Swiss-Prot record:
This is 1-deoxy-D-xylulose 5-phosphate reductoisomerase. Mn(2+) binds at D147, E149, E218. HAMAP family: DXP_reductoisom. The keyword Membrane does not apply. Its EC number is 1.1.1.267. Catalyzes the NADPH-dependent rearrangement and reduction of 1-deoxy-D-xylulose-5-phosphate (DXP) to 2-C-methyl-D-erythritol 4-phosphate (MEP). InterPro entries: DXP_reductoisomerase, DXP_reductoisomerase_C, DXP_reductoisomerase_N, DXPR_C, DXPR_C_sf, NAD(P)-bd_dom_sf. GO terms for molecular function: 1-deoxy-D-xylulose-5-phosphate reductoisomerase activity; manganese ion binding; NADPH binding. It is an enzyme of class 1 (oxidoreductase). It comes from Chlamydia muridarum (strain MoPn / Nigg). It catalyses: 2-C-methyl-D-erythritol 4-phosphate + NADP(+) = 1-deoxy-D-xylulose 5-phosphate + NADPH + H(+).
Length: 379
């Protein structure tokens, strides 16, 4: 039985993690929970259902309320609480289901304590890929990707000779705006952006999907996650979202992972790895899914992939700057300060002006992130 820490339990991924655990109850126990969002009622329900030993929250009001409701459970708050949840001695696997760089200290602390990492937090690798992967190698810690694309690549690469790998291919649905012209993209509304054709996600990642910055972040994540520096990483539009990732080998063979577009598939794979359990939902029926389309990404309309590859070429602190600036710009769009098309145009302008430096510590990363957000909030 695996003993789990779950960071981000009330978010979209966190709730689906718990859905898998409900269906395979004999395989897992929730030791600790952390929820830093505002979904207080959902967290209370989760505590009652799963009886974790330790719970961490962000705000003081929720902290005080939970202490009254659950006097027998250790309730913590702040960054220290998050780290305590992630590194509890009884935990085997830390599941990082939250988005944003706030989870990075807990990720680093978990690796230091040699916990297996189930990672749905792409920002940790985009902002601090070298630090995270170096520490993981040093401590012999395995990072298992929950993102559907990286999970697909992980399955295709398992047991393969790195010297035989030619290319990694990430697929993208194209987001809610994929069929709009460049002129139409100048006028899109928040309502249009948040109406994703395939995935039900939070607002930030849905905006990232619409700009294809999300796919750019995933290219950077794949670079660090798989450590295949000499291998080309590409992204293609695949509107059906049935193939989630592909690996091309030197002999021309391409392996892929196919399943219906549900995060329950990669979540179950990671939680049960290296074993395989019967799927908790129906798989792919080839007789009813007969069309597979693949389209190139139009750089004129969606330059985010090019920007992500610029990040990899620049190295150093650019990944952290790219991530922090994008997060701030997305928040400005969500609050109505800037138009949708300005997210990437301002991001490119900021990147062009930024002077890359080395990032040797967690403190360096957090400093660059803070600077990026400040600049993106003012431009």
């Amino acid at each position: 039985m695996k003993r789990l820490a779950l960071i981000g339990s009330t978010g979209s991924i966190g709730k689906q993690v718990l859905q898998v655990i409900r269906e395979i109850p004999d395989a897992f126990v929730i030791e600790t929970l952390a929820a830093y969002g505002r979904n207080r009622e959902s967290l209370i329900s989760q505590i009652r259902e799963f009886s974790p030993r330790v719970v961490a929250v962000r705000d003081e009001t929720t902290y005080k309320e939970l202490r009254k409701l659950f006097p027998h459970i250790e309730i913590l708050s702040g960054e220290e609480g998050l780290i305590a949840v992630a590194t509890a001695a009884s935990v085997d696997m830390t599941i990082v289901a939250s988005s944003g760089i706030d989870a990075l200290p807990a990720v680093m602390a978990s690796i230091q304590e040699r916990k297996t990492i189930a990672l749905a937090n792409k920002e940790s690798l985009v902002a601090a890929g070298e630090l995270v992967t170096t520490l993981a190698k040093k401590n012999h810690v395995q990072i298992l990707p929950i993102d559907s694309e990286h999970n697909a690549l992980f399955q295709c690469l398992e047991g393969r000779d790195p010297s035989t790998i030619k290319k990694l291919i990430l697929t993208a649905s194209g987001g809610p705006l994929r069929n709009k012209s460049k002129e139409e993209l100048q006028k899109v509304t928040l309502q249009e952006v948040l109406k994703h054709p395939i995935w039900d996600m939070g607002p930030k990642i849905t905006v990232d999907s619409s700009t294809l910055v999300n796919k750019g972040l995933e290219i950077i994540e794949a670079f660090w996650l798989f450590g295949l520096q000499a291998v080309e990483i590409e992204a293609v539009i695949h509107p059906q979202s049935l193939i989630h990732g592909m690996v091309e080998f030197c002999d021309g063979t391409i392996l892929s992972v196919m399943n219906p577009p549900s995060m329950l598939f990669p979540i179950q794979h990671v939680l049960t790895f290296p074993d395989r359990y019967p799927s908790i939902i129906s798989g792919l029926n080839f007789l009813t899914n007969q069309t597979l389309e693949f389209l190139p990404i139009d750089d004129e309309r969606f330059p985010s992939i090019r920007l992500a590859k610029d990040v990899l070429r620049e190295g150093g602190s650019m990944g952290c700057f790219f991530n922090g600036a994008n997060e701030a710009l997305v928040q400005r769009f969500l609050s109505g300060e800037i138009a949708w098309y300005q997210i990437v145009s301002k991001l490119q302008t900021l990147m062009d002006k930024y002077v890359v430096r080395s990032c040797l510590s967690l403190e360096d990363i957090l400093q660059v992130d803070s600077e990026a957000r400040a600049l993106a909030s003012e431009c």
